[in-house]
């Protein structure tokens, strides 16, 4: 049985809350973003605070987008997922000394 695009029968055996990611829809969305932003004078960055699931991050990084991070942990997750350090921006306020060192040690693009 399906409800919209969701195969409900696959989910009936799960007894715990979970997230369902439609990877095909993500792929189509990322394709469209890349297509619409190529040859533009700006660069797309994904905000890790929205969702730091490593599988999703790897997929997004594979499109050549940058990462917008607001913590040292997000900087590390971005690098681990394959975002080039040259496209990692560390934004936000209240960075600890340790977080600043993480950014510097990984040679990220900039601090905001």
Language-model region placement:
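A charged N-terminal "starter" segment
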Residues: 1-111
């Amino acid at each position: 049985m399906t409800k919209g695009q969701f195969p409900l029968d696959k989910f009936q055996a799960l007894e715990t809350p979970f997230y369902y990611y439609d990877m095909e829809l993500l792929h189509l969305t990322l394709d469209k973003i890349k297509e619409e932003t190529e040859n533009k004078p700006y660069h797309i960055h994904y905000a890790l605070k929205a969702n730091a699931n490593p599988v999703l991050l790897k997929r997004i990084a594979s499109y050549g987008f940058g990462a917008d991070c607001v913590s040292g942990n997000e900087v590390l997750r971005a690098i681990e997922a394959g975002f080039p350090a040259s496209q990692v921006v560390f934004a936000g306020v209240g960075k600890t000394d340790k977080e600043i060192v993480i950014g510097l040690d990984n040679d990220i693009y900039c601090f905001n």
